[in-house]
Swiss-Prot record:
Designated name of the protein: Large ribosomal subunit protein uL16m
An example Gene Ontology molecular-function term: rRNA binding
Main localization, broad class: mitochondrion
Keywords from the named record: Mitochondrion, Ribonucleoprotein, Ribosomal protein
Family: Belongs to the universal ribosomal protein uL16 family.
GN (gene name): RPL16
Secretion signal span: none
GO biological process: mitochondrial translation
Amino acid sequence: MVIIKKTHNSFSLKHRHCNHTLKFGRLGLKILSFSKITENQFNLIERLSLKFLKNLSGNKKLIKIWSLVPFNLTLTKLSSEARMGKGKGAVYSRAFFLRPGSILFEFEGVSKHQLTQISSILRKKTSFRIVEVQLPSK
């Protein structure tokens, strides 16, 4: 049983590199601005990219996608009629705080052209800036 605890910490807006290199895939999507994404928004982004990749490849190629972003926030909410001093409220969703330079997705089995098409679609759907990255060729 997983217990989701309420978080009280706020995240600093300092530029810190901890998840800025590709670990598994050959291509990836990197974030260039601070942002907070809820679990529903992240699932929507993931479903859009999967759907677009399946349409492009025609289910013929083996495509792998990794997302290494941990959910580090719990979003809580009290009812609108609650008075002061009644606590923080119930957890209604999870989210994570993104810093510039963090990798959102890593891809394997995707061409550079397909990745640019995916990123152009995701730029229209999200409020943060996205850039494509790739491993240097040997």
